[in-house]
Amino acid sequence: ITLDPDVQTMDVDLRNNTTKMDYKVTFDWPGMRYNPRDKIVYKWLPSLYYNDRDGYAPGIRIDRSYGEWEKKMYWINYALNKDPLKNKNNFYWSYLNVFKPIHSMQNTSFKLWGFSQPGLQEIGGEIEKKWSKTYRKSPYHVNKAGFYIQPKVDTLRTNLYDPGKLAVVYLKHKIYNNYIDFDSEVSSSVEPYSDWSFNRVT
């Protein structure tokens, strides 16, 4: 039995239907905003890194998305020069996953990320909640809670960071409308996973 074959009703999430989801593979053109409701979209884009130690590092980025509810990004690069300290070629990667529940926890999103890039590594997670005191009327509020961990810094490939590991938890709040845009943040290091100790309010 096929119900609503022309997709006339407001079923905002077709992923849980018995009919198998279709998909579309396309090049990630600049400014592209292709978000169909009845397809999983895969967008790809070639990538190229360069630094003095790794030389060129060709790769590819692949984005997987379903409307505004699910977004994943996979990014990989392979260095053509061997690392003299490891005697092998370095493999660099990035991963991002953003998920919004549809049938519960309205206006809430979950984000997970991780990367190993020339000079820096990081993993992290975040929960975001958007709300307003009067439904869909300003001022709007955005609350975020999250963490990130940077286990080490390779100072041979970047001079933007001091050596050492870093672990941080944070809370963020934003309130905005057409006339104001106010951001605040409370963050703190996490011992013993951080070589720095601090508490910060901005």
Language model features: what each stretch is:
Residues 111, 176-202:
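Extended beta-strand-rich architecture
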Residues 120:
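Extracellular interaction modules
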Residues 46, 74-78, 110-114, 142-151, ...:
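Membrane-embedded beta-strand positions of outer-membrane beta-barrel proteins
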Residues 4-105, 124-139, 144, 155-178:
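Outer-membrane beta-barrel initiation region
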Residues 94, 115-117:
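Compositionally biased, intrinsically disordered low-complexity regions enriched
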